[in-house]
Each structure stands twice: as C-alpha cells, then as structure tokens.
C-alpha cells in the first residue's frame, strides 16, 4: 500500500500538478514562516541575535510541519485506514512539484517562441530571483534551463528521497526546509543573519539528493537520446562551479547532456553576481533546450521513483 501511495501521488503530480486554488501545505508553511519571522525580528535586535533567532525559527517551522503532518496522518488512520491512506497520498502529492515546474517553464517558453520578450521576461521573473528586465532570448533560455535543472532536485528527487527515509511526514518536513531557504535563505543584508541557518540546513538536506540527481540525469540523458556520458562527465567536472554546494550537480549534468553553457553573470537585487560558467558551449542555447530539459526532468523523476521502489522492495522483501 505504501508503494501504491507513492505511485498514485507521482501520477497525480504528473497529470494535474498544483491547481492554483487548491489548498496546499507549502502556502501554510509560508504563512507560518512569515509569522515566526515577524516575532524573531521584533525580539532579536542585532545580527548575532538574529542568527540565533533564525535557528529557533528553523526548528519551530520544521518541527511543527513534521509534527502536524504526523498527527494528521495518525488521526486519519484512526478514523479509517482507507481515509488515512488517502490523506497520505494527498500529502505526498503536495510535496512533488514536477508539473508545476514544467508549467512554469512552458509559460516562459511560449511567448519566447513568439519573440514576445516583454511577456517572457515577466513570466520568468515569477520563477527566478535575478533581474529579468533586460534579458535577451539566450539569457532567458539559460535562466529557464537552470531553474528546471536545479529544481529537479528540490522539487522532485529530494522529496522522494525523504519520503523513502521517513514517509510523508519527513517529506513534508523537507518542504519546510526548502521553503525556509526560498523565503529567507539569501545573502543580502536583509536576510543574511536571520536566514543563515535556513540556508545552511537546506544545503545539508539537499546534499545527497543533489548527487543522486547527477546519476539520474545522466542516465536520463542517455534514455532521451542525448549524450549520457558527456552529461556525467561535465556534471562531475563542473559540480562545484556554483556558490551552492549542491546546485551545480544537476545544472552541470543538464549542460553536458545538451552541449550548452549555463551560469555566468547575472543581476540579483540590483547587484551584479559573476558566477562560474558551467558546461562547454558546443553550440548556442536555444528555446528548444527548455523542452529538452523538461523531458530530462520527467525521465529522471521516473527513474528516482523506480529506484526508491526497488530499494523499498529490497529492504522489506515485499512488492
């Protein structure tokens, strides 16, 4: 039944994703973060106090998320086993973001194919932190490919990884870790102190999933009739060409698979950030690379699910 729940949740994400008006735990987690952050800022003046308060905020948000998820599942199971199972499927489904990621990328891709730069820049600004107002088509393509490659880890592979380790409650706790990082884990002045713990704990949580993504995306590249060997080679060579210890694993693998370069200079919050280049520019990046990257994401996601099912069967001895 556990494996069936995983599969149904994955299929639901593949088919319908996250409908905008449906209730979603990540939105609730975001509201909790906003509430706790307001309290921390009120009572923790100064950088040192903010760092400590940020650590407390991380424990409160992640702990509360795990506890509520565990409690809701336990209560649902007591009401009826099938109800508990249905709630588990829903929880797992909400931790996966493959369809949402693909949809967001396609929202940028469509106007870009029509040479509508203004619209593609606006749509891109919804999913990236960099300044998109002056980006040219190649830069927009690169930003979308990077976003899909990076979020293949924290939107799909990592939730499945923590689902395997600790069930739906731990997968939900991971989403809290990831949401904390996306809301406060920045290096500029406003968040540097309060978000330090959140940023570092996100690095810790994604350490193994990011490295697993290198292998899965490399295999996916071969299955998609791209260069799997080059994906693995470039992925390994450029795995540390990023300020994050995790992001370049998937980005470099995708760059190798496609034969393009990612990274380079960008503007964030009004400041120029010069990132190392990732991959070799064997050809110019094109809008078609967006759809190729989405395909890589889905194949890697399928491989991740299959791997974890096989591991579960191997450990439990049952299908």
From Swiss-Prot:
Disulfide pattern: none
Gene Ontology terms describing biological process: cobalamin biosynthetic process
Annotated TM spans: 3-23, 56-76, 82-102, 153-173, 296-316
Gene Ontology CC entries for this record: plasma membrane
Domain of life of the organism encoding this protein: Bacteria
Transmembrane helix recorded as keyword: yes
GO molecular function: ABC-type vitamin B12 transporter activity; threonine-phosphate decarboxylase activity
Membrane topology: Multi-pass membrane protein
Cell compartment(s), UniProt: Cell membrane
Pathway: Cofactor biosynthesis; adenosylcobalamin biosynthesis; adenosylcobalamin from cob(II)yrinate a,c-diamide: step 4/7
Pfam families per UniProt: CobD_Cbib
Keywords: Cell membrane, Cobalamin biosynthesis, Membrane, Transmembrane, Transmembrane helix
Entry-linked NCBIfam families: cobal_cbiB
Function description: Converts cobyric acid to cobinamide by the addition of aminopropanol on the F carboxylic group. However, the true cosubstrate could be (R)-1-amino-2-propanol O-2-phosphate, leading to cobinamide phosphate.
Entry's family note: Belongs to the CobD/CbiB family.
Protein name per the record: Cobalamin biosynthesis protein CbiB
Classification lineage: Bacteria, Pseudomonadati, Pseudomonadota, Gammaproteobacteria, Enterobacterales
Gene name for this UniProt entry: cbiB
